[in-house]
Curated annotation (Swiss-Prot):
Subcellular location: Cytoplasm; Nucleus
This protein's record includes keyword Cytoplasm: yes
Organism whose genome encodes this protein: Mus musculus (Mouse)
Gene from which this protein is expressed: Cand1
Role played: Key assembly factor of SCF (SKP1-CUL1-F-box protein) E3 ubiquitin ligase complexes that promotes the exchange of the substrate-recognition F-box subunit in SCF complexes, thereby playing a key role in the cellular repertoire of SCF complexes. Acts as a F-box protein exchange factor. The exchange activity of CAND1 is coupled with cycles of neddylation conjugation: in the deneddylated state, cullin-binding CAND1 binds CUL1-RBX1, increasing dissociation of the SCF complex and promoting exchange of the F-box protein. Probably plays a similar role in other cullin-RING E3 ubiquitin ligase complexes.
Protein known as: Cullin-associated NEDD8-dissociated protein 1
Length: 1230
């Protein structure tokens, strides 16, 4: 410490030197010292350092002054509070000095100090005291109006301080407002401009009284309209407030918008520009309140989009060059001060109109059809705009319209809607000829910026409507070639042109381009040879696509590709051989050459084997190996049967070695490559090559990565079919891993299917020790040897499926095995595990093989229905259903008879029936539909909910077999007097909805509204199942319910309310316990709301939606958890709406986070509260991602509370870490 003080006093001494270099070096050294975390200053040193730095601010040398200012930043955080106050006092005094240089340096110093203060949310006392000190001095400096430059600096600092520390100055806000308002009429426009900026920052954190005073002042001044100059300023000010605090100004729009509309009609271009800019900020920041005025705003924008009084467009076809009046091809973004004619300000009005239309189009999804009628044609007509900056904004607005039209949601592609002929997509389709006509002329413009806009537009158009340009390729190709060949084209323009060409090639059929290949190949080949790597990279993508165009392998083509092969090959091989090129170019050269060999390899002659040798080299390189594996997979799968023999000997062992690399994408790619090589090149592979691969397989077959396991098993299946002799090697570790995987509870889906295919392929190869009985013993052994009982029920299902797969492959073995399983079920000494496996195996075998010859099968299974084990009973039920599928005439009448005659076994028998309906073919079931239907209806009023649910599922799945007849019948039962029957039919509808198209869909769409009317049913349970059905439709097939939302949502929202009459007290011994019978239905309603956010967001009134989210934040644990999830989604989907409601959302979140559990509560209560806090904190973290959220005083205060509470701070920190690591993972493309 002493040595530090000595060193610093040395520096201070040098700072008094008459030599400016000494002073500079000493100040620089002090700066270095202050930046060290370890530095500690005693009081005396602090005082001296502060005094010296303040003295150096007045140094004669500018460089020393600048360094001294920089020292203020680290100094503020190293000295005590009263020293910081000394610094601030001195700087404020100096700001009013007569010396201009001292004023300037002091204002920079103040900004530096403010920038170093801890943020308002940290609750720092230092920040509060310093800001209060500065504020008084600044307000008087601003109010004096003596020296404009002082005023401007003071306004600048005030704005800076309000933006960073506005929340700490709440007590000063009224005086700040009082000093700022008069500046809006200052004779100096610069003063007005900075005042507007300061007011913009003030409204983010000021209280309501100050905000109301400000708005009332602006409204009254606007109404007076004293001078055009001040009116312009007030409109600008309102726009700035709206941009910074749109969520607060919304309620005043009813008064503001009529005034702004009125001023649009005044003949003053500058005022018009500001008015339209104000509209833009209202549209973006006050979506709900601006809604009634959107049509007016659109009309005003459409009017002024074409406002060009000083220019005559006459007939645009006459004068090709009219577009580019100023003849510039300057690529810079023009500033506000650049325009063609000093007196003509009309371009700024047109630009404001284009930007405002952009805002409207981007924020009002629900008006898309309307936009295509009015806005789209108007924008297309303005592609001819003569002012380049305006033209860029017109293009941008149209791009926004296209982006809104992208069919990301299923309802946009809904076939029913498409037939109506007025969807956004069909309307866009009809306007494509006009778009192309307008762009065609612009694509030959001198202006680079214009041509880039054209390419972006075409790219987006094709992404939205693939195939849209089929008729227009002849018109567009010359424009693309023009930019590729143009010597004056910038690199970015060429990249955009290539990228556009690539998207067009990918999204249209090859035949469309055949007439243009001759013109396209030379410029693309030239771009592949371009010295700039980004152009090369993009050109290689295009080349790869061109190869597919000139010789498509998936369809017949008469086009002669021969003249182009040499050029395409030569330019690509040059890039493939180059060693020092960019990584992306390397990869794309490999992919492109892979495509050339795949599609044109039979025309390459001797070049083929040389190129394959290069591939072999690339396979040995860690950086290029994955891309090369993918290229080889492509080549090996080519129908041209390319000769790969020259590289297989060396290549296959290299591929085998990749299977042990710790890179998942490489393992998967390699397994695909090996699979296709075995299929197509088995005669060229040796036993040694295959053994090398087999040696690497055991570690890949494991439950830790099911996808890799699935690929490995598929490879083994191919091997069994194509190269059966190699399988003798697998009986050791590979087979052990496979059998281990069959017993894993995680084996299902694609991996299970692959496993079944493998066993069927293996058992017929006749490999030693791998015959039917050997494999059967391996699979079922553990169940019979009591030592290793399988713990998971899923394992039994997997083994049974494998047994059935083996039996299907060897049908002769079937009767004996089935007989053995029947004995296992009958045998009184069999364990439950053995019975379980035997029943499931009988079911799986009987599903595919008719077992009606086994006479005692029925009685054995029915006997198992009486087992004390629930799992055995469930397996018997499944087995009976599955066996029935194998011979419906024999078993289905038997099952129906049993359901009628055996009431005690009804539940299990209904499960058997469900299995039959789910699995049997439609044709097989058709004759029995009426009998099944009649039986089910008898049981749909059963008081037992479990039975009713099975009946409902059967009814729903049965309806799918003959929807025309059965759906109207289901609908008929909605008027049943029994609430049980009504709930059964509503639940049945849920099972008719799936996420893929079905014949029932149009019929369902017509009548689902009737089923959803049960949301008004008097019975609570019927309403609950109606919500569950609605949720299923919203999730799986939103097109069914989109048009019903206006009538459904009020009933849905109604069910989110807590009902006092459904809450009752139950006495449990000495304790009283509260039971809420309405909880389940509220939960169902909130689940529907969550689903609607993903599937029907554009049809929701988000503010009404938020009202109910707010209620949910104060509800039961389960519902709070759901609403926290909703807040996370809403923060991403509609940030501006959430921002408007932020203050109302913060309080319930704070309440959850600060709730304490009673000390004597059970452990479960503590865990629940902990989970609630974590979820609430996730919601808070999501809310804070909304720009400007932390500027809300309540949110800022809550943040301080979190950071000052160690428990909450720790939770919050871990959540932020989690979210950042999740973001990184999602970026990892491998």
């Amino acid at each position: 410490m002493a040595s530090a003080s000595y060193h610093i006093s040395n520096l201070l001494e040098k700072m008094t030197s008459s030599d400016k270099d000494f002073r500079f070096m000493a100040t620089n050294d002090l700066m270095t010292e202050l930046q060290k975390d370890s530095i500690k200053l005693d009081d005396d040193s602090e005082r001296k350092v502060v005094k010296m730095i303040l003295r150096l601010l007045e140094d004669k040398n500018g460089e020393v002054q600048n360094l001294a200012v920089k020292c203020l930043g680290p100094l503020v955080s190293k000295v005590k509070e009263y020293q910081v106050e000394t610094i601030v006092d001195t700087l404020c005094t100096n700001m009013l000095s007569d010396k201009e240089q001292l004023r300037d340096i002091s204002s920079i110093g103040l900004k530096t100090v403010i920038g170093e203060l801890p943020p308002a949310s940290s609750g720092s006392a230092l920040a509060a005291n310093v800001c209060k000190k500065i504020t008084g001095r600044l307000t008087s400096a601003i109010a004096k109006q003596e020296d404009v430059s002082v005023q401007l600096e003071a306004l600048d600092i005030m704005a800076d301080m309000l933006s960073r520390q506005g929340g700490l100055l709440v007590n000063f806000h009224p005086s700040i407002l009082t000093c700022l308002l008069p500046q809006l009429t200052s004779p100096r426009l610069a003063v007005r401009k900075r005042t507007i900026i300061a007011l913009g920052h003030l409204v983010m954190s000021c209280g309501n009284i100050v905000f109301v005073d400000l708005i009332e002042h602006l409204l009254s001044e606007l109404s007076k309209n004293d001078s055009m100059s001040t009116t312009r300023t007030y409109i600008q000010c309102i726009a700035a407030i709206s941009r910074q605090a749109g969520h607060r100004i919304g309620e005043y729009l009813e008064k503001i918008i009529p005034l702004v509309v009125k001023f649009c009609n005044v003949d003053d271009d500058e005022l018009r520009e500001y008015c339209i800019q104000a509209f833009e900020s209202f549209v973006r920041r006050c979506p709900k309140e601006v809604y009634p005025h959107v049509s007016t705003i659109i009309n005003i924008c459409l009017k002024y989009l074409t406002y060009d009084p000083n220019y005559n467009y006459d007939d645009e076809d006459e004068d090709e060059n009219a577009m580019d009046a100023d003849g510039g091809d300057d690529d810079d973004q023009g500033s506000d001060d650049e325009y063609s004619d000093d007196d003509d300000m009309s371009w700024k009005v047109r630009r404001a109109a284009a930007k405002c239309l952009d805002a409207v189009v981007s924020t009002r999804h629900e008006m898309l059809p309307e936009f295509y009628k009015t806005v789209s044609p108007a924008l297309i007509a303005r592609f001819k705009e003569r002012e380049e900056n305006v033209k860029a904004d017109v293009f941008h607005a149209y791009l926004s319209l296209l982006k809104q039209t992208r069919p990301v949601q299923s309802w946009l592609c809904d076939p029913d809607a498409m037939e109506q002929g007025d969807t956004p997509l069909t309307m866009l389709q009809s306007q494509v000829p006009n778009i192309v006509k307008a762009l065609h002329k612009q694509m030959k413009e001198k202006s680079v910026k214009t041509r880039q806009c054209c390419f972006n537009m075409l790219t987006e158009l094709v992404n939205v409507l693939p195939g849209a340009l089929t008729q227009h390729i002849p018109v567009l190709v010359p424009g693309i070639i023009f930019s590729l060949n143009d010597k004056s084209s910038s690199s970015n323009l060429k990249i955009d042109a290539l990228s556009c060409l690539y998207v067009i090639l990918c999204n249209h059929s090859p035949q469309v381009f055949h007439p243009h290949v001759q013109a396209l190949v030379p410029p693309v080949v030239a771009c592949v040879g371009d010295p700039f790597y980004k152009i090369t990279s993009e050109a290689l993508l295009v080349t790869q696509q061109l190869v597919k165009v000139i010789r498509p392998l998936d369809q017949p083509s008469s086009f002669d590709a021969t003249p182009y092969i040499k050029d395409l090959f030569t330019c690509t091989i040059k890039r493939l051989k180059a060693a020092d090129i960019d990584q992306e170019v390397k990869e794309r050269a490999i992919s492109c050459m892979g495509q050339i060999i795949c599609n044109l390899g039979d025309n390459l002659g001797p070049d083929l084997s040389n190129t394959l040798q290069i591939f072999l080299e690339r396979l040995k390189n860690e950086i290029t190996r994955l891309t090369t594996v993918k290229a080889l997979t492509l080549i090996a799968g080519s129908p041209l049967k390319i000769d790969l023999r020259p590289v297989l000997g060396e290549g296959v062992p290299i591929l085998a070695s990749f299977l042990r690399k710790n890179q998942r994408a490489l393992k998967l790619g390699t397994l695909s490559a090996l699979d296709i090589l075995i299929k197509n090149y088995s005669d060229s592979l040796t036993a040694a090559m295959i053994d090398a691969v087999l040696d690497e397989l055991p570690p890949l077959i494991s439950e830790s990565d099911m996808h890799v396991s699935q690929m490995a098993i598929s490879f083994l299946t191919t091997l069994a079919k194509v190269y059966p002799s190699s399988l003798s090697k697998i009986s050791g570790s590979i087979l052990n891993e496979l059998i281990g995987l069959v017993r894993s509870p995680l084996l299902q889906g694609g991996a299970l299917s692959a496993m079944l295919d493998f066993f069927q392929a293996l058992v017929v190869t006749g490999t030693n020790n791998l015959g039917y009985m050997d494999l059967l013993r391996m699979l079922t052994g553990p169940v019979y040897s009591q030592s290793t009982a399988l713990t998971h029920k899923q394992s039994y299902y997997s083994i049974a499926k494998c047994v059935a797969a083996l039996t299907r492959a060897c049908p002769k073995e079937g009767p004996a095995v089935v007989g053995q399983f029947i004995q296992d079920v009958k045998n009184s000494r069999s364990t439950d595990s053995i019975r379980l496996l035997a029943l499931l195996s009988l079911g799986e075998v009987g599903h595919h093989i008719d077992l009606s010859g086994q006479l005692e099968l029925k009685s054995v299974i029915l006997e198992a229905f009486s087992s004390p084990s629930e799992e055995v009973k469930s397996a018997a039920s499944y087995a009976l259903g599955s066996i029935s599928v194998g011979n419906l005439p024999e078993y289905l009448p038997f099952v129906l008879q049993e359901i009628t005659s055996q009431p005690k076994r009804q539940y299990l028998l209904l499960h058997s029936l469900k299995e039959i309906i789910s699995s049997a073919s439609v044709a097989g079931l058709k004759p029995y539909v009426e009998n099944i239907w009649a039986l089910l209806l008898k049981h749909c009023e059963c008081a037992e909910e479990g039975t009713r649910n099975v009946v409902a599922e059967c009814l729903g799945k049965l309806t799918l077999i003959d929807p025309e007849t059965l759906l109207p019948r289901l609908k008929g039962y909605l008027i049943s007097g029994s609430s049980y029957a009504r709930s059964s039919v509503v639940t049945a509808v849920k099972f008719t909805i799936s996420d893929h198209p079905q014949p029932i869909d149009p019929l369902l769409k017509n009548c689902i509204g009737d089923f959803l009317k049960t949301l008004e049913d008097p019975d609570l349970n019927v309403r609950r199942v109606a919500l569950v059905t609605f949720n299923s439709a919203a999730h799986n097939k939103p097109s069914l319910i989109r048009d019903l939302l206006d009538s459904v949502l009020p009933h849905l929202y109604n069910e989110t309310k807590v009902r006092k009459e459904l809450i009752r007290e139950v006495e449990m011994g000495p304790f009283k316990h509260t039971v809420d019978d309405g909880l389940d239905i509220r939960k169902a309603a909130f689940e529907c709301m969550y689903t609607l956010l993903d599937s029907c967001l554009d049809r929701l009134d988000i503010f009404e939606f938020l009202n109910h989210v707010e209620d949910g934040l104060k509800d039961h644990y389960d519902i709070k958890m759901l609403t926290f999830l909703m807040l996370v989604r809403l923060s991403t989907l509609c940030p501006s709406a959430v921002l408007q409601r932020l203050d109302r959302l913060v309080e319930p979140l704070r309440a959850t986070c600060t709730t304490k559990v009673k000390a004597n509560s059970v452990k479960q209560e503590f865990e629940k509260q902990d989970e609630l806090k974590r979820s609430a904190m996730r919601a808070v973290a999501a809310l804070l991602t909304i720009p400007e959220a932390e500027k809300s005083p309540l949110m800022s205060e809550f943040q301080s509370q979190i950071s000052s509470n160690p428990e909450l701070a720790a939770i919050f920190e871990s959540i932020q870490k989690d979210s950042s690591s999740t973001n990184l993972e999602s970026m990892d493309t491998s």
